């Protein structure tokens, strides 16, 4: 069963069970500056889980594009991904444990055809705060799960909370038995031996935690998440997500192009290219800050591993074409934004190639200087960064491949001192946003909104504001543009809007 079939089955199944199908939120959160990317299906729905009414009702389902960046360095093994898709269904004060579990069991066994004996589940074991979740366990037994396939764990494994305080509750997780040999007589889902693979998690938000402890919520919610890539891999009997149709065409092409064989490098190139394309398609652009730096890091790590495979970097355009052709049915925006994706990624490649060559050469010189130690100083890492623009994470990866450690603590101290020195020298010049508030700066601030609107008309929706700085002396407006722009047309649009004399309202 292909990934798109699994996705469609999921959405259709929950639609039949009264759920409204809602669109995936963008990878770049629109109104949540606390996170770089959308990391889970529930993230865009937090206001509704807290009680706000959703326009589509109390039963929702969707597929959500997600990016998680904490495991970038692990990509290259047989399971880690930066970009992934999460299938989810939610009850906002509607059904609860019994119906949620019954639907999950039905979908797994009837829609996907997974044999009952292949499934194991875990439930909350209970503690001094909250009781053992017998309701969930009994619901699984009623559905058809074998009693000796039900396990109980504590808060570390079967409890969910968003932060220190807030809505929380027990969860129940579903595991697929791969058929691999048990690691011991006590082998169970909590093992990390690979026999059991988690496939779905249903969170039951029935409590609220504050400084006084736990209290029952008036509105009980259900939040579930099923990883599409992992489920596709298991249903196809594959060992890794890279063996499925989601990656097969790009992996095959990389194998044809490579002059040095490395399955790890092929996986890194394939995964980081897909992730970068998804981020760019949703409006992300490389930079030295926040999500822009994550994107830059993904593209540059991909390029370094193309070099390791001795693949001509001019092939990058072809690799993008292969990915678009393979994924366009699942993600039509990739085809729509193909030229923008190419432009952004290829431009970043050109910027990095010289840095990579110089940085690797200087790194090797520093390694050759070491005699009785296998540790590279933080000073060297900082020198490569400060003098040659060589990213510290690339130095770290090179050192690891060469059997060396690096003193990251020393590097971080030097980097922090460098930041403080730079900040002190440019605090006034580069202060962001509205630095002062009077008639002049308010006029400039209004002008930024007019300019932003005009740019979107001239350039298109791919014109994204990246910052602004407003003082009584000047206005600075930062934005990115994927092609040459027409200054004259932008000014005409701004002046036309100004001439309308639209009344302005000050919101304080």
State each model region's role.
Residues 488-508:
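The Walker A/P-loop phosphate-binding site
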């Amino acid at each position: 069963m292909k990934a798109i079939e699994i996705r469609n089955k999921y959405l259709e199944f929950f639609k039949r069970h009264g759920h409204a199908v809602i669109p995936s939120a963008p990878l770049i959160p629109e109104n949540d500056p606390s996170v770089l990317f959308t990391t889970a299906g529930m993230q865009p729905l937090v206001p509704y889980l807290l009680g706000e009414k959703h326009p589509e009702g109390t039963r929702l389902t969707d597929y959500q594009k997600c990016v998680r960046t904490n495991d970038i360095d692990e990509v290259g093994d047989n399971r880690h991904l930066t970009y992934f898709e999460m299938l989810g269904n939610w009850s906002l004060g509607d059904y609860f444990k019994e119906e949620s579990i019954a639907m999950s069991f039905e979908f797994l066994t009837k829609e996907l055809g997974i044999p009952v004996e292949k499934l194991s589940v875990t439930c909350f074991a209970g503690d001094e705060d909250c009781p053992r979740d017998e309701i969930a366990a009994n619901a699984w037994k009623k559905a058809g799960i074998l009693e000796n396939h039900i396990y109980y764990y504590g808060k570390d494994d079967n409890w969910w909370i968003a932060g220190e305080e807030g809505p929380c509750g027990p969860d129940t997780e579903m595991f697929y038995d791969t058929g691999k040999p048990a690691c011991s007589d006590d082998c169970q889902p909590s093992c990390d031996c690979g026999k059991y693979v988690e496939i779905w998690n249903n969170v039951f938000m029935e409590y609220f935690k504050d400084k006084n402890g736990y209290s029952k919520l008036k509105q009980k919610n259900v939040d579930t998440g099923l990883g599409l890539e992992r489920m596709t891999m298991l249903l196809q009997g594959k060992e890794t997500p890279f063996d499925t149709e989601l990656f097969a065409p790009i992996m095959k092409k990389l194998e044809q192009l490579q002059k040095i064989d490395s399955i790890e490098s092929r996986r890194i190139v394939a995964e980081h290219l897909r992730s970068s394309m998804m981020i760019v398609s949703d409006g992300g652009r490389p930079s030295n800050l926040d999500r822009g730096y994550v994107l830059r890091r993904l593209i540059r790590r991909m390029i370094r591993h193309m070099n390791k495979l001795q693949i001509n970097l001019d092939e990058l355009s072809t690799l993008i074409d292969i990915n678009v052709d393979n994924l366009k049915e699942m993600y039509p925006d990739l085809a729509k934004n193909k030229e923008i994706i190419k432009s952004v990624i290829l431009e970043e490649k050109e910027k990095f190639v010289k840095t990579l060559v110089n940085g690797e050469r200087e790194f090797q010189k520093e390694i050759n200087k070491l005699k009785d130690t296998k540790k590279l100083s933080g000073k060297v890492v900082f020198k490569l960064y400060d003098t040659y623009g060589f990213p510290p994470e690339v130095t770290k990866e090179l050192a690891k491949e060469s059997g060396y450690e690096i003193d990251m603590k020393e590097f971080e101290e030097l980097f922090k001192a460098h930041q403080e020195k730079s900040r002190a020298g440019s605090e006034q010049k580069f202060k962001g946003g509205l630095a002062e508030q009077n008639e002049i700066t308010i006029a400039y601030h209004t002008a930024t909104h007019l300019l932003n609107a005009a740019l979107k008309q001239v350039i298109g929706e791919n014109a994204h504001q990246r910052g602004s700085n407003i003082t009584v002396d000047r206005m600075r407006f930062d934005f990115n543009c994927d092609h040459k722009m027409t200054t004259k047309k932008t000014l005409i649009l701004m002046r036309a809007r100004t001439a309308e004399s639209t009344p302005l309202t000050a919101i304080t």
